Structures are given as structure tokens and as C-alpha cells.
């Protein structure tokens, strides 16, 4: 049986609107700090920074 992998599922949230609409995965060995990605916000109708919540 395979062991637990290095990738974790993380939820991305926006501080301005409180949205938590993106789910992605990251390698916890390569990126131990919180993940920040620019994604589209449907409420603001523009691309903003979404930060790791979980």
C-alpha cells in the first residue's frame, strides 16, 4: 500500500470579500509557508490575491 503523499489540499480565501471558492493542492515539503495565488473574484469582477486558509 502506498503511504501518505507530500501533497496537501488547501482552500484559498479572499480577505476583502470573505470568499473561499478555490481548492488546490501544494507540496508541503517545497512550500512550507502559506500559499498566495492571484485568482479571479466573481464578486469583485477582477483578479485579486487569494491566500491559504486551511
Swiss-Prot record:
This is Large ribosomal subunit protein bL33. Keywords: Ribonucleoprotein, Ribosomal protein. NCBIfam families: PRK00595.1, rpmG_bact. PROSITE patterns: RIBOSOMAL_L33. It holds the Pfam family Ribosomal_L33. Belongs to the bacterial ribosomal protein bL33 family. GO terms for cellular component: cytoplasm; ribonucleoprotein complex; ribosome. PANTHER family: 50S RIBOSOMAL PROTEIN L33, CHLOROPLASTIC (PTHR43168), LARGE RIBOSOMAL SUBUNIT PROTEIN BL33C (PTHR43168:SF2).
Amino acid at each position: 500500500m502506498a503511504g501518505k503523499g507530500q501533497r496537501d489540499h488547501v482552500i484559498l480565501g479572499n480577505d476583502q470579500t470573505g470568499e473561499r471558492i478555490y481548492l488546490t493542492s501544494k507540496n508541503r515539503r517545497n512550500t512550507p509557508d502559506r500559499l498566495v495565488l492571484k485568482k479571479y473574484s466573481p464578486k469583485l469582477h477582477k483578479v485579486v490575491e487569494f491566500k491559504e486558509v486551511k
